UniProtKB/Swiss-Prot annotation:
This is DNA ligase. The gene is ligA. Pfam families: BRCT, DNA_ligase_aden, DNA_ligase_OB, DNA_ligase_ZBD, HHH_2. It is an enzyme of class 6 (ligase). The keyword Ligase applies. PROSITE patterns: BRCT, DNA_LIGASE_N1, DNA_LIGASE_N2.
Length: 698
């Protein structure tokens, strides 16, 4: 058996012979992956992919017990320690946790505990983060650190004593006199330190680490402790190993507090629960805030709080019965590229996009992924027909990490030939100096660029015309209702003049929908200066740059007058823009080029005659909410989310998306989410919609 398609396996229909072939195949695959993960610090598959294979192995062995081998992965923890390190026998086995992947799994975990203990209630459960690092055990004898080791295979680990001592915050001595006192935890590297470390590796011409977990593992397992000392390692402790004082703590909650008192680093984001609802609520809250953490986590851990109950529950050969890890959905998946198309952006950038067999990653179905540019395709040797690994973090656009070369079919995979001309208007593509992206320079006549600029102009952060989405814009352009941005504001009047094919008569539109659209267009005619500047889609002018330009020019008239002087090579204006922090040479150059095109100037002149562009209203630190960060949550009855954001910005505030220690104020509407709970925990000031409106009006 060379390959295995697990989607076709029905365990209930397996014969013993077929099951044996699959288990034999899985044994070899899992052993290979264990070697790469635990010993080489260079995983070949994602955690999620590994979990799928291991769970399949466990289920088959459960149905066919005679297939269980001495080294069967249903009874295995970790990987055999490397011969490069001296071996350490764990006085108390370092077991791995059983995994749960859905609410039902966690519910079953509680039910099994109740049945085992013969109780009819949920015992108290401590809910903690599952840190994605390298597990370790540290032994103290009479208060002195004498030995530290990795998990290894759960029975025998690797001696990392001298390496662990290089972590500055790790206690070398403890104010206790116990003969043996072992703590267990996780060694990790923060996301920011990981990025810095990889930059250093690149400068030194060394291999880059694939993720923070591998960086931490590779750093603590250095043969030379001096190298480990140069790495920004951190740790959390969360459990005991072997101890001679069995009365140190009676519960997990008490243990975490006492470990903290001993000056160990303990993650303080844990809660005590006694029901499934609050356990799942903890998981959901953590999942929401996951991408805002300084370090990587891959789930949460639930542990029975009472150590006496933990002792009664005991463990299987691989995992304790009193704990379970509720893993986050996979952020990495594998799927097939069916085609590669080209997408032309509002500034002419031509981006290759991979069309994929749809795959669900972290609850989101993904069918497209950007390939960025020609160099990206060539450097990763990405071809049509390839199976690729996708990565998605939070709401970030999915990225193709690499190709599964073992699955490549040479006969069916096809190299993508990047064209020399624009797929929309056939003009020659150019790659500007200092860039890697190919661009179409036919900005005024390229249909794709016209379409994208209109979409940008009406978008949420620009003029925010509700009801005018991409599909409707495509319809209006294709059917000649509009040909440019100005036509949007003439749409209502022009529609009245039509003798046939009025918008309200078109299927999918309707009189109510059309009237609402016209109302929204008219409301959008009143716009603040920075949003107007942003809406123009000048290259290198984003939302922040637009605010800086609005702050500099104050009025629409001055913005246009000064920009025209800039286009006419007035050095004073150019130098002034170049010296504004956050703008610089690139923005000044692009604004100059934009106003050198007469068609752009004509467009702006027409828009100024149609729109009411409000002057910049920033008044420095005298504004009510100057230098404050405000977050909004829930739905609001009297104002839209976009309008309330504008209100905040007019008062000098910075609008955030997540609640953190840097948040000054949370404004809550109906059906407020997890942000409210987080703000309450952090002691952040909270007001409702009515109080907000009163504040704004004052």
């Amino acid at each position: 058996m060379n390959k295995l398609d697990i989607s076709t396996i029905n365990i209930e229909q397996l014969t013993s012979d077929h099951a044996k072939k699959i288990v034999d195949f899985l044994a070899l695959e899992l052993q290979k992956y264990d070697q790469a993960y635990y010993s080489d610090n260079n995983p070949l598959v994602t955690d999620a992919q590994y979990d799928v294979l291991k769970n399949l192995n466990n289920k088959i062995v459960a149905k066919f017990p005679h297939l269980a081998l001495v080294n069967d992965h249903s009874k295995k923890v970790g990987f055999t320690p490397s011969a490069q390190f001296s071996k350490v026998v764990h006085l108390k086995p370092m077991l791995s946790l059983a995994n749960g992947f859905c609410v039902e799994d966690i519910s079953n975990f509680i039910t099994k505990i109740q049945n085992f203990l013969k109780i009819d209630h949920c015992p108290k459960i401590v809910c903690e983060y599952k840190i994605d690092g390298l597990s370790f055990n540290a032994r103290y004898e009479y208060g002195v650190l004498t030995l530290a080791s990795t998990r290894g295979d759960g029975q025998i680990g690797e001696n990392i004593t001298e390496n662990l001592k290089t972590i500055q915050s790790f206690p070398q001595t403890l104010p206790i006199t116990d003969k043996v006192f072992e703590v267990r935890g996780e060694i990790y590297i923060t996301n920011n330190d990981f990025r810095v470390l990889n930059i250093q590796q690149q400068k030194l011409g060394k291999a880059l680490f694939s993720n923070p977990r591998n960086a931490a593992a590779g750093s603590i397992r250095q043969l030379d402790p001096a190298i480990t000392a140069q790495r920004p390692l951190k740790y959390f402790v969360y459990a005991l190993g072997e101890v001679t004082n069995h009365h140190f703590a009676s519960t997990q909650f008490e243990l975490l507090q006492k470990l903290s008192q001993l000056k160990f680093s303990v993650n303080t984001d844990y809660i005590l629960s006694d029901n499934l609802h609050s356990m799942i609520e903890f998981y959901n809250n953590v999942a929401t805030e996951r991408n805002n953490l300084a370090f990587e986590i891959d789930g949460v851990v639930y542990k029975v709080n009472d150590f006496a109950l933990q002792e009664r529950l005991g463990a299987t050969s691989t995992s304790p019965r009193f704990a379970i890890a509720y893993k986050f959905p996979a952020l990495i998946g594998r799927t097939k590229i069916t085609n590669i198309t080209l997408q032309v952006g509002k500034t002419g950038a031509v981006t290759p996009v991979a069309l994929l067999i749809p795959i669900n990653i972290a609850g989101v179905t993904i069918s497209r992924a950007t390939l960025h540019n020609k160099q990206e395709i060539e450097s990763k040797d990405i071809r049509i027909g390839d199976y690729v690994f996708l990565h998605r973090a939070g709401d970030v656009i999915p990225k193709i990490n690499g190709v599964d070369l073992s699955a490549r079919d040479a006969q069916s995979s096809t190299r993508f030939i990047f064209p020399a001309t624009c797929p929309s208007c056939n003009q020659n593509l150019v790659v500007n100096e200092g860039e890697t992206v190919a661009r179409c320079g036919n900005s005024l006549a390229c249909p794709a660029q016209i379409y994208e600029r209109i979409c940008h102009f009406v978008s949420k952060d620009a003029l925010n015309i509700d009801g005018l989405g991409r599909q409707r814009i495509r319809f209006l352009l294709d059917n000649k209702y509009i040909v440019n941005i100005v036509d949007i504001f003439l749409l209502e009047e022009n529609n009245k003049l039509l003798s046939s094919n009025k918008l309200e008569d078109i299927a999918g539109w309707g009189i109510k929908s059309v009237n609402k659209l016209f109302k929204n267009i008219n409301q959008a005619k009143n716009v603040i200066l920075d949003r107007f500047i942003y809406a123009l889609a000048v290259k290198h002018v984003g939302k922040y740059s637009a605010k800086l330009l609005a702050k500099e020019f104050k009025t629409a008239k001055n913005f246009i007058d000064q920009s025209l002087k800039l286009a006419n090579n007035v050095t004073e204006i150019y130098e002034k823009l170049c010296n504004i922090e956050g703008l610089g040479v690139k923005t000044a150059d692009q604004l100059k080029q934009f106003f050198m095109v007469s068609a752009n100037v004509n467009l702006i002149t027409k828009l100024v005659n149609i729109l009411t562009i409000q002057d910049w209203q920033y008044h420095g630190d005298n504004l009510l909410l100057s230098n404050q960060t405000i977050v909004f949550t829930g739905t609001f009855a009297t104002v839209s989310r976009s309008e309330i954001k504008v209100q905040a910005e007019k008062l000098g505030a910075k609008v955030g998306t997540q609640v953190s220690n840097n948040t000054d104020l949370l404004v809550v509407g109906n059906k407020a989410g997890n942000k409210l709970q987080k703000a309450q925990q952090l002691g952040i000031k909270i007001i409702n919609e009515e109080e907000w409106i009163k504040m704004v009006n004052e």
